[in-house]
């Protein structure tokens, strides 16, 4: 018996572009979630003091709240940028290393917009961080570069 929630004929799909095939089903976009924005990104680090220093002193995030959770033997650090809550930084005892290369499924990188990529690179170089050479986005023509956080999470700087 067909599932009425996904019972859309192929002909209907091509006539009504509010539908798209997802996970082997055809879903009606009129019933999709109405997400508003990314609320925050949670990052687990292997060396809490080093990552805290990186995200605050190198990248310029502000500390909104920091707590040690005894039951989890873990720190939780809430970080904001320009008044917007963005990152939860967690420490856990002996977390497994993140696989960055070869690229694996899951989070690929996080990207931050900057006014000037070359100025951002100069600031990072002054702090002994050396991003990849600047590239140009083939679609937008904008400049971008990558470097890594202390646990090799790729971070992109994208010029707006």
Task: Locate predicted features.
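Vicinal oxygen chelate
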Residues: 19, 26-34, 67, 78, ...
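N-terminal amphipathic/basic-hydrophobic helices that include classical n-h-c signal peptides
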Residues: 1-31
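Core segments of cupin and vicinal oxygen chelate
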Residues: 44-86
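A short, acidic/glycine-rich surface segment
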Residues: 64-66, 72-74, 94-100, 133
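Exposed loop/turn and edge beta-strand positions of beta-sandwich/beta-sheet ligand-binding modules
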Residues: 37, 73-75, 106, 141
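N-terminal beta-strand motif that seeds the catalytic metal site of vicinal oxygen chelate
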Residues: 26-49, 107-110
